[in-house]
């Protein structure tokens, strides 16, 4: 389970949970990747997990960094493994996750600029961070052969289908404009096709 957070050096505000799928192929098969898809919220991030992490992980991390003389402001990504003994922290990242951000941020009600300014100013405790009571899913379109060898330079078509469609997003990653102004593939993970859902049962 992935959990993103905003931090202002003292206060930490937790965003909604997300669940990443790392394997390159369907059915949880193939090599590990940077993430082939994600959805938010994660059904495995229960109230019990949330309470445990708020007590032992989130604020404790912020307090420890401050105690070491390096208070942190920005975004902290918590990569959690849920075990019979309770949640374990597998990794920290000082950034948004990809594709976690693609499914968490569309659900956020707050203006992200207000939240960032609060992180900078040390006033995050005054922000009531809220998320829509819905779900969001992102499927990554990857180049054939990823995460090993793959070709680049293939034209990407069909993007016009996302125009003026509320709740649908197309996030670019491994893409670029070629010399003719066409958008072509330029990496392994090319696009994140994302949709807001009214229910996670959909």
Residue ranges and their predicted role:
Residues 1-104:
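Internal nucleotide-binding/catalytic subdomain
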């Amino acid at each position: 389970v992935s959990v993103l957070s905003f931090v202002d050096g003292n206060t930490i505000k937790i965003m909604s949970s997300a669940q990443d799928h790392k394997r390159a192929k369907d059915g949880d098969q193939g090599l590990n990747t940077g993430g082939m898809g994600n959805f938010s919220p994660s059904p495995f991030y229960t109230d019990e997990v949330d309470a445990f992490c708020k007590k032992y992980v989130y604020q404790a991390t912020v307090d420890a960094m401050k105690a070491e003389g390096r208070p942190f402001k920005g975004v902290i990504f918590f990569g959690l493994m849920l075990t019979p003994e309770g949640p374990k922290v597998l990794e920290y990242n000082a950034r948004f996750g990809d594709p976690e951000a693609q499914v968490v941020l569309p659900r956020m009600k707050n203006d992200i600029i207000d939240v960032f300014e609060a992180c900078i100013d040390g006033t995050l405790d005054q922000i009531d961070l809220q998320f829509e009571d819905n779900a969001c899913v992102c499927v990554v379109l990857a180049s054939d052969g990823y995460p090993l060898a793959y070709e680049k330079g293939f034209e990407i078509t069909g993007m016009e289908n996302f125009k003026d469609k509320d709740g649908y997003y197309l996030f670019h990653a491994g893409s670029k404009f070629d010399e003719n102004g066409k958008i072509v593939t330029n990496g392994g993970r090319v696009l994140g096709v994302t949709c807001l859902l009214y229910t996670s049962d959909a």
